[in-house]
Amino acid sequence: MGAKDLAEKNLLQYKDVFSDIVNVNLFGGKCYVSAEELSREPGELITKTVSDDKLRQLQMDVPMKCKKNNRSFFLCLENQSDKNNVMPVRDMGYQHAKYMEQIKEAKESNRKTSNYPNPMTKELNDSQKLSPVITLVLNYSQK
């Protein structure tokens, strides 16, 4: 990882910078997400591939959780220095892993409390909602 990439990640970890970027790019500059509503999330996600059942490590650049009006959603800023045609697929992988992490936590909670959904094929109870996962790619290339 280059010094430039580290500097970009370091800057984006400041919650006020992060919220400004999100507000400008998602909400047209309206102050919807404040720095106070953000908390840092681990960037490392461990997931299991379906094809060969092996564990894989994914590394998101700067993920944060936003708690607003008793609801939560996840935001991730990804830096891109050069054009990369597979970036959307990588982002889908990050989002998939984050959703699967939430499902795993909800199912574990159900197991601990013996509060299983009915029928079991539903996997989650009707009251268990997944928090949205939103990724923004910041492309710094000139192309």
Q: Residue locations for each model-derived region?
A:
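Accessory alpha/beta interaction modules
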Residues: 1-143
